[in-house]
């Protein structure tokens, strides 16, 4: 089971604050822990062991935001994380 989180500024609003997208919806970092925990609760114990979170982030977002995301995932017991970064044209 894989959960995808996208972090970056919206394409249609360059210069705006970075936002989080969990699956197909926009979420606030304060909601992330509860949403991921709810997703994990629907999994079997075997699936929870294999659960992987992929964070795809804009290379230019603040590291403090990624730290908040990582802390939220830790609270949801989602500790298998892969980070990828992309260079958006500014």
Sequence positions of predicted segments:
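Long, low-hydrophobicity, acidic/polar, solvent-exposed interaction domains
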Residues: 1-90
